[in-house]
Swiss-Prot record:
It is found in: Cell inner membrane. The keyword Transmembrane helix applies. GO terms for molecular function: transmembrane transporter activity. The keyword Kinase does not apply. Pfam families: MFS_1. The chain crosses the membrane at residues 6-26, 41-61, 79-99, 104-124, 142-162, 166-186, 230-250, 274-294, 297-317, 323-343, 361-381, 384-404. SUPFAM superfamilies: MFS general substrate transporter (SSF103473). GO terms for cellular component: plasma membrane. Its main location: membrane. Coiled coil: none annotated. This is Putative transporter AmpG 3.
Length: 421
């Protein structure tokens, strides 16, 4: 039991990650909305989160470059984690001295730095939670704890931030966020450095452009030598995300069209929904540990189809608080359940010394898929009624099933992948 205490550390680091993520995507935009800033300005502030989509660019550097003294003293992963945490704390401290409503440009710059530091921490945490576990059961637990921590952080950064701002003001909200972030370096010092499955070749010399591309090339090749495998996996991930990404992107427009109040959306969808997502994520991790990757991914994908179906039912019935609660429950449970499982699947594909780079490549494609699906969904929703739109969403999402079996029949099966862990 003592050996698995690192899972608590992963949970706490996930919490910090979720808190800083929501700081950019929810807390600051909400404060600016209260100050009556226009949506275009609020939207432009959100561009500060761009590093989250571009982690793959500097993940090879994190895999290859060893920070003098820190990496030799604390280990490669912990050394990088300490650096990202220290700079994150400095950026959060600087943010305390800035009023977002009065200093938009400085706010955007500091948020960009926070985003860069937080996404760097995410790269290291992704690699840590893949390398540290010693069995596939522990791998599932590591991703489950990380998922729970991230969503708890999101809960603190949204509902918790709103209540604190009402009682104490926004400055106290950011002080609270800084206080939580300070826990990060302490956690990193308390957990052990993981032992990589393959020997890690690092350097203290800044890697050149040729070496940089060599790391990316080797990372992609080591995912799988057969190109067809990679293409099928990419198509599978794209279709798998459709049942979650489209309903999530279209949820607010649908709820407002059906005349649900802001209070109902905040309490039921934001607060209650996040708690249900945590439960779903935990159960998804347990299922993956018990049944393995192959069956878990299939079950998660099928259950996820209930999400757009419930949105279709809600859109057909109209305003009904009971159906609304059921829809939110189903959608968030499915998002947490399938989200944890697909993350574990991503981790199972990473099997070389370039774990951080490999996971960043896969996760970046997943994020890109979510953005594309949300954008396409918005265009389609403009020309269709809500019930027809979500019925189409359900049918489109079902296409992942034949792709899944296409992969299995070509011996690109998830069972063999899970045995590599």
């Amino acid at each position: 039991m003592y050996k698995k205490l690192y899972l608590i550390g992963i949970l706490l680091l996930g919490l910090i990650s979720g808190l800083t993520f929501n700081l950019i995507f929810f807390t600051v935009p909400y404060q600016l909305s209260e100050a009556k800033y226009t949506t275009d300005i609020i939207g432009s502030i959100s561009l500060a989160a761009f590093p989250y989509c571009l982690k793959v660019i500097w993940s090879p550097f994190i895999d290859k470059y060893s920070i003098p003294f820190l990496c030799s003293k604390f280990g490669h992963r912990r050394g990088w984690a300490l650096v990202s945490q220290i700079f994150l704390i400095l950026a959060m401290t600087g943010f305390l001295n800035v009023s977002p409503c009065n200093n938009l440009y400085i706010t955007a710059i500091i948020l960009f730095i926070i985003s860069f530091c937080s996404s760097t921490q995410d790269i290291v945490l992704d690699a840590y939670r893949i390398e540290r576990p010693t069995s596939k059961e522990e791998l599932s637990m590591a991703f489950t704890f990380s998922s729970i921590g991230f969503r708890l952080g999101m809960l603190l950064g949204s509902v918790g931030a709103l209540y604190l701002s009402i009682i104490f003001g926004w400055n106290t909200v950011y002080k609270f966020a800084l206080f939580i972030t300070v826990v990060g370096p302490i956690v990193i010092l308390c957990i052990k450095e993981p032992k990589p499955k393959e020997k890690r070749h690092t350097t203290t010399n800044l890697i050149g452009l040729q070496q940089y591309f060599e790391v990316i090339k080797k990372s992609i090749i080591s995912l799988k030598n057969e190109q067809q495998y990679l293409l099928l996996i990419m198509l599978f991930v794209f279709l798998y995300k459709a049942a979650d990404s489209i309903p999530m992107a279209m949820s607010s427009p649908l709820f407002l069209d059906l005349s649900f109040t802001t209070h109902e959306i905040a309490v039921i969808y934001k607060a209650y929904g996040l708690l249900i997502m945590i439960v779903g994520g935990a159960l998804g991790g347990v299922l993956a540990a018990k049944m393995g990757i192959f069956h878990s991914v299939l079950i998660g994908g099928v259950i996820q189809l209930l999400s757009p179906l419930m949105f279709m039912i809600l859109a057909t019935i109209g305003y009904d608080i009971r159906i609304f609660i059921i829809t939110v429950t189903v959608q968030n449970f499915c998002a947490g359940f399938a989200g944890t499982i697909i993350s574990i699947y991503f981790a199972s594909l990473c099997n070389s010394e370039f774990v951080a780079t490999q996971y960043s490549i896969i996760a970046s494609f997943s994020s890109l898929s979510r953005i594309i699906l949300a954008s396409l969904g918005g265009i389609c929703a403009k020309y269709l009624t809500w019930p027809v739109f979500f019925l189409g969403n359900t049918l489109f999402s079902m296409l992942f099933i034949p792709i899944f079996y296409k992969i299995y029949r070509k011996k690109l099966d998830f069972v063999n992948i899970s045995k590599k862990i």
